[in-house]
Curated annotation (Swiss-Prot):
The keyword Protein transport does not apply. The lineage of its organism: Bacteria, Pseudomonadati, Pseudomonadota, Alphaproteobacteria, Hyphomicrobiales. PANTHER family: POLYNUCLEOTIDYL TRANSFERASE, RIBONUCLEASE H-LIKE SUPERFAMILY PROTEIN (PTHR33317:SF4). It comes from the Bacteria. GO terms for molecular function: nuclease activity. This is Putative pre-16S rRNA nuclease. Could be a nuclease involved in processing of the 5'-end of pre-16S rRNA. NCBIfam families: RNAse_H_YqgF. It is an enzyme of class 3 (hydrolase).
Length: 161
């Protein structure tokens, strides 16, 4: 099964009215996850998966998608600063292709440039220790990515009125 990739504007028509969204910050060593509320207004950091191998990572992701009745998966697309696509984008797309063979949920890519940097800056401003930052930065970056999509959905709804 090929990955079904949607645009943000397509989500309201394709996702149930109270289905949550899961945000994903895919890294080489970890996968940060975030969850929306059922009204799709607020993103909350959920957990960080320590990457072991794809099959184990996918099992946990699918468990959470089913547990929280997620309607779609929002995955950060790590574009280069100039907007070009490098090796990390290709790795992300390969991950989505592999995951789509196991899950029937649609995916939305969201530009994640500087998301981890923004979260790290915010944590430093809050005087969070380096050790604690390392524990939470990935799931907070996933929440940052997901919140971007939720905010965009709100703008789309406002424009439709």
């Amino acid at each position: 099964m090929a990955a079904e990739i949607l645009e943000v504007a397509d989500l309201p028509a394709r996702v149930g009215p109270r289905q949550r969204l899961i945000g994903i910050d895919l890294g080489t060593k970890t996968i940060g996850l975030a969850l929306s509320d059922v009204e799709r207004r607020i993103a909350t950091p959920l957990e960080t998966i320590q990457r072991i191998k794809f099959s184990k990572d996918a099992v946990r992701l699918i468990e959470l998608a089913e547990k929280f009745d997620a309607g779609a998966l929002i995955i950060g697309l790590p574009l280069n600063m100039d907007g070009s696509q490098g090796p990390r984008v290709q790795a992300t797309r390969a991950f989505v292709r592999s995951l789509s063979a196991l899950v029937s949920k649609p995916f939305v890519y969201w530009d994640e440039r500087l998301s981890t940097a923004a979260v790290t800056r915010s944590l430093i401003d809050q005087d969070v220790s380096r050790l604690k930052r390392a524990e939470v930065v990935d799931k907070m970056a996933a929440a940052y990515i997901l919140q971007g999509v939720l905010d965009r959905l709100r703008r789309i709804e406002a424009d439709a009125v």
